[in-house]
């Protein structure tokens, strides 16, 4: 993740920017480990001098729950957004149906990612390559949100850019936005 990372995050950022409710899948206590783009690049440079073949897990440290990460961004931006928790089974089924009908940008990866834990042990890369992440999840998300907030008008008019450099189409999420 970096300052210009948008895609589906652009939808989240729009909700935060407008002070809307953030609909959470389940209790929001699940964790997902991000990696800051500059940290990933730094790790790749360090790996160039590594004279062995190995597999490394890479990611941020001190991974907090989605509740904590989102509240950090909300609190540090002055947003009026608040978290609303919905039953995991109900939300996941709804996301699957909407995806199958072609009316949602959220696919199988997203419904797994936002409802389960994805945190990996990064001890090996730290010990063998001397890698240390520089940003935590909440700091990365805040940087990305701030970029969105400062550039939202130009972002709306972008053409021919990658999916991660523009805001994803909301589809059925537009209806959810009305109730937010």
Tell what function each PLM region has:
Residues 47-106, 122, 142-143, 151-160, ...:
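Mid/C-terminal beta-alpha module of Rossmann-like enzyme folds, strongest
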Residues 1-32, 37, 73:
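NAD(P)-dependent short-chain dehydrogenase/reductase
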Residues 1-2, 24-30, 56-64, 74-77, ...:
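Glycine-rich Rossmann NAD(P)(H)-binding loop
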Residues 15, 43-46:
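Conserved C-lobe helical segment of Hanks-type protein kinase catalytic domains
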Residues 6-10, 67, 119:
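Short, surface-exposed alpha-helical segments at coil->helix boundaries
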